[in-house]
Amino acid sequence: MLKEELEGLNISVGIYQNTEEAFTVPLIPLGLKETKDIDFSVILKDFILEHYSEDGYLYEDEITDLMDPRQACRTPSRDEARVELLMTYFIQLGFAWIRFKKYNTSPRIFFYRYDSLNGVLVSQQNLLLEKASVLFNTGALYTQIGTWRYWQMQAGLQSAIDAFQRAAGVLNYLKETFTHTPSYDMSPAMLSVLVKMMLTQAQESVFEKISLPGIRNEFFMLVKVAQEAAKVGEVYQQLHAAMSQALVKENIPYSWASLACVKAHHYTALAHYFTAILLIDHQVKPGMDLDHQEKCLSQLYDHMPEGLTPLATLKNDQQRRQLGKSHLHRAMAHHEESVREASLCKKLRSIEVLQKVLCAAQERSRLTYAQHQEDDDLLNLIHAPSVVAKTEQEPKGPLSVFLANKQWMPPRSNRFTAEEGDLGFTLRGNAPVEVHFLDPYCSALVAGARGGDYIVSIQLVDCKWLTVSEVMKLLKSFGEDEIEMKVVSLLDSTSSMHNKSATYSVGMQKTYSMICLAIDDDNKTDKTQKISKKLSFLSWGTNKNRQKSASTLCLPSVGAARPQVKKKLPSPFSLLNSDSSSY
């Protein structure tokens, strides 16, 4: 019975939605991994007595401090305070793993967790199951926070974007760290889909944030909104394809896959609708920047329809209207498909707000087409090309290269041409691609390209995530036309290093590394002056001894006196995982 209730609750797309949002397409949250009550105080006390030769009852408060967060995490509220509580419990589990892991064994405590998708109970005598489940619940809680945010305010939408991105980060960390989990909802294949789903919903939130102030009937604004909508439709299409893979198709909730398909068609339809509006309502007026408009229109498509050019289309009212009506025709087709897909899923049919949004968008496109419809449209309509997906919410680049501890020079633009099909340089590496060797007489070298440069864009096309073959294909596609390639290069690390005395002399705030250096110096001095008394195994981390011991393994000596008072163990935040963090 509990299994069926968990499955029905956690796979519902209607749960955790903000009831005050009257006209918002629902999002997909994750349910928490439920558990059972566990009392491991007796087991830990026995272990302390057996291994450390100390009375376990002296540490009742500390053991209670470990058990209380676990109980509180079972029913967390949807706010940042509960996320902090989950992370506190996760970190305490890391310390417990170090304290009580003996060789290849640990205290025999059974941990129980239910699969969040199908409700199957998993039980193991392994603390790593508990740690992995806490991480999963942290990511799930972030999804519920993102779903619950107020979408009628910019701050609420930004909070939703942040929450979904944090959820994706936590789940991706879980996938890379805990590689052999017994629960299917934490398998690498399922976590990959969940990460993609969170990033997709973050992208949807970006579109809603752009649209919230209102969409002006202005050329450049409509181009931006159309491409953002196309981006959302594209990522939802990719998500639906990922959900249809053999490894996850049988276990992914049908309502999730259906909603991904519905949104893929819905946002693709919006992209065609906004493109149609910018074409039909556009008027060439004196003083307009036609060059900029021509460039934007050319970048809106992979290719223009046969017989049309961007500039001629902008100047010709008839061509613009015909192309705009073609986009409306495609928009209505996608709207019809989104409504049909939503009607096939029982859970989606029951979500009234979703049906209203889909029908309203479909009716708007139909009315717009009816206003400009002519008798011979079916004979004269051309096939409207797909809108190129583009967004302002692009990732910075691969983390292996673009990270804060590397110093970068400002981006440089190099303009050059390929002479007789020869670029004059070679490429290497994965994403991002690096310029390796340049011919001494090639035009790229004359334009300013250097060996070791990383290619970030070519003709405004983002290349930070492209492979060598993809970048080479893009470069050769321009033939002998001029190519604008933007590159960045690493700053010489030796030129930006500052010694310790120079930093202190100007009164700068001490960094973490400097504090560690200072502590190390103090420790060396203390060792020559006196020998500190050995500490009991649970006394690490107290304010009195925080700088005297940098280890969590301060075990009692054989001759150490038994402590007479109970010692309070604080909640340290420096240990995220142990070396044995994978199954």
Curated annotation (Swiss-Prot):
All copies of domain PDZ, residue ranges = 412-490
Q: Report the residue ranges that make up the BRO1 domain in this protein.
A: 26-375
List the Gene3D superfamilies hit by this protein, alphabetically.
Answer: 2.30.42.10, alix/aip1 like domains
Q: Which InterPro entries match?
A: BRO1_dom, BRO1_sf, PDZ, PDZ_sf, RHPN1_2
Any matching Pfam family: BRO1
Q: Name one GO biological process term.
A: negative regulation of stress fiber assembly
What protein am I looking at?
A: Putative rhophilin-2-like protein RHPN2P1
Task: Give the encoding gene's name.
Answer: RHPN2P1
